[in-house]
């Protein structure tokens, strides 16, 4: 995670003080961890160290697949970034492994938020797998009305807006909407924003294209979000599946005939 060490330590100590949970011990422990973090990176986990819910869900995997999973898990993920256009990528002054004419993996991703090009809104961070579906939409008529049903934090929406297309951004979460607005401001992009539950959308408005990046378990992003392993219970897969099915059904009523 890209948080400054001193900020993590100070924040943790302040919380410990409020909860009366040994702030002195927490302060000393975190400082020691920060000092020896390179040694900690050498520690390898076994599959049996992972939460029981995850082991059960992956019981179908072969020994080779589990071994491969652990090898990938221990690798630090590179940050994938997407540019507004080809010219901005050409002017980029850092090492980049290109994945398209407007995107690539940062090979030196330390403190990427401090780069002038990031501050100026030339690009945004977006997982490669999230980037691909919209990248394939090369030829979309500018008269098409597009709805991004679960827009925040905005990666897919930014791809569409960068092509000067008409897209309405929706998200159920007020907190995520705020993140979306912050990102739009930095990127100097604008769009109509809705804060609704997509399943409750009425049938009055119709759309030519509906993008659904539905809520999911996030298990596929474990390398970037290892905190998933620290939850007492795993994701409620049945509940998530039901939600995804309901969202797809809702979309079928909101799409134009040729959508």
Question: Where do the model's predicted regions map?
Answer:
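S-adenosylmethionine
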Residues: 1-259
């Amino acid at each position: 995670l890209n948080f400054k060490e001193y900020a993590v330590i100070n924040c943790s100590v302040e919380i410990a003080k409020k909860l009366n949970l040994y702030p002195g011990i927490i302060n000393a422990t975190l400082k020691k961890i920060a000092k020896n973090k390179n040694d900690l990176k050498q520690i390898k986990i076994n599959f049996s160290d992972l939460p029981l819910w995850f082991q059960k869900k992956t019981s179908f995997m072969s020994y080779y697949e589990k071994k491969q999973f652990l090898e990938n898990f221990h690798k630090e993920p590179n940050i994938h970034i997407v540019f507004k256009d080809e010219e901005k990528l050409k002017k980029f002054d850092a090492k980049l492994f290109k994945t398209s004419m407007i995107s690539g993996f940062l090979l030196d991703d330390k403190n990427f938020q401090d780069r002038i090009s990031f501050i100026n809104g030339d690009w945004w961070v977006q997982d490669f797998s999230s980037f691909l579906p919209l990248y394939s939409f090369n030829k979309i008529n500018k008269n098409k009305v597009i709805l991004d049903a679960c827009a925040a934090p905005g990666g897919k929406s930014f791809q569409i807006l960068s092509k000067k297309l008409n897209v309405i951004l929706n998200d159920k979460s007020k907190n995520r909407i705020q993140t979306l607005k912050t990102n739009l401001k930095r990127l100097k992009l604008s769009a109509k924003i809705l804060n609704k539950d997509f399943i409750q959308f009425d049938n009055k408005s119709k759309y030519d294209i509906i993008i659904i990046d539905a809520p999911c378990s996030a298990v596929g992003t474990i390398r970037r979000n290892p905190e998933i392993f620290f939850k007492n219970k795993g994701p409620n897969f049945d509940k998530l599946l039901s939600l995804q099915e309901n969202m797809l059904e809702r979309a079928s009523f909101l799409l134009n005939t040729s959508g």
